[in-house]
Amino acid sequence: MQFSTVALFAVAAAFVSADVVTEVDTQSTLVTITDCDSTVTDCPARQTEAPVSSAPVSSSAAANTTVAGVSTYEGAAAKGQYAAGVAALAAGALLAL
């Protein structure tokens, strides 16, 4: 009885966490161009104009009163795996009786 309960918990935990993926970027390199050869016609280091921004600019701090919408509906919770894990645990509890 105890082995089946432990096995059921292990299977349920593995099922719930099966969709969790962790990625680590180990290949990115940041390069800043500070100077170019005189033959380069479009050198970013010689740029005299400010970059064009498509975002509206406001000079008043009070004008920006909108709150960013943040969603917590993502990852494993969005796929219903927690519900499947709970169902598996409930089934195991019924079998243990």
Swiss-Prot record:
GO terms for cellular component: extracellular region; side of membrane. Residues 76-97 form a propeptide. Glycans are attached at N64. Keywords: Cell wall, Glycoprotein, GPI-anchor, Lipoprotein, Membrane, Secreted, Signal. Residues 1-18 form the signal peptide. It is a lipid-anchor; GPI-anchor. Disulfide bonds: none annotated. It is found in: Secreted, Cell wall; Membrane. Belongs to the TOS6 family. This is Protein TOS6. The gene is TOS6.
